[in-house]
């Protein structure tokens, strides 16, 4: 049996929480979707394996890849779409966690021509500016070239929509990435519901967004949200 450092064990435990929290918040899609985690600037990363649901992940099922997709630790298969993660990691050394899932409302919302608005608190986390949309293909991102294109679309943003496919979220902490993925789905859902009204809908004016972000999305509040999600999952 392989041995792991304390730091490696903790990273795998946090990544397991990330996967299960996303599943607990409606982002499971049978065995599809994946999350990765690394130390900032590292040339390897831990990843959820293929053929396993987000809700099924345990610390000992995770695999570690290099940026070329070679498995350097673990025995299970990797996802074909590892280039989403590797190319964002190459492009942005500060990023430690990348989430790619297929949440229902985000897919539906991104298929419209609406820009995301701050219809809800969650929307204010992302816009303005608008959340970018990757439109080159709705197929799987299985090559370095396509991964680079996704990373270019994301740019310096936290999130982007993959049209008719899913979402990508990247952040400097695993907690931030997971919460942002959940909040993007919530923001997409609320705006879809509001836009279905024949009466039109309102959203927070752009000039009020900085104050709203400063009040709602503080590190202390985000830590409390993460801890709540972890309590729902229980010990790992």
Predicted features by range, described:
Residues 1-236:
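Glycine-rich flexible loops
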């Amino acid at each position: 049996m392989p041995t792991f450092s304390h730091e490696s064990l903790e990273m795998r435990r946090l990544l397991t929480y990330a996967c299960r929290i996303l599943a607990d918040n409606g982002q499971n899609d049978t065995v599809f979707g994946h999350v990765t985690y690394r130390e900032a600037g590292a040339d390897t990363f831990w990843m959820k394996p293929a053929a396993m649901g987000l809700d099924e992940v345990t610390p000992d099922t995770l695999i570690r890849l290099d940026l070329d997709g070679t498995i350097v630790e673990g025995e299970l298969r990797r996802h074909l779409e590892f280039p989403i993660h590797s190319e964002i990691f190459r492009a942005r050394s500060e990023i430690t966690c990348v989430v790619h899932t297929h949440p229902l409302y985000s897919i539906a919302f991104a298929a419209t021509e609406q820009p995301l608005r701050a219809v809800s608190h969650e929307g204010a986390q992302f816009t303005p500016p608008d959340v970018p949309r990757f439109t080159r293909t709705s197929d799987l991102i299985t090559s370095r070239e396509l991964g680079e294109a996704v990373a270019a679309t994301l740019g310096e943003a936290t999130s982007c929509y993959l049209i008719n496919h899913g979402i990508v979220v990247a952040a400097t902490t695993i907690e931030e990435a997971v919460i942002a993925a959940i909040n993007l789905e919530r923001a997409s859902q609320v705006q879809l519901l509001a836009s279905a009204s024949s009466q039109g809908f309102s959203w927070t004016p752009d000039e009020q967004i900085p104050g709203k972000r400063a009040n709602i999305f503080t590190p202390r509040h985000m830590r409390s949200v993460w801890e709540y999600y972890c309590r729902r999952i229980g010990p790992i």
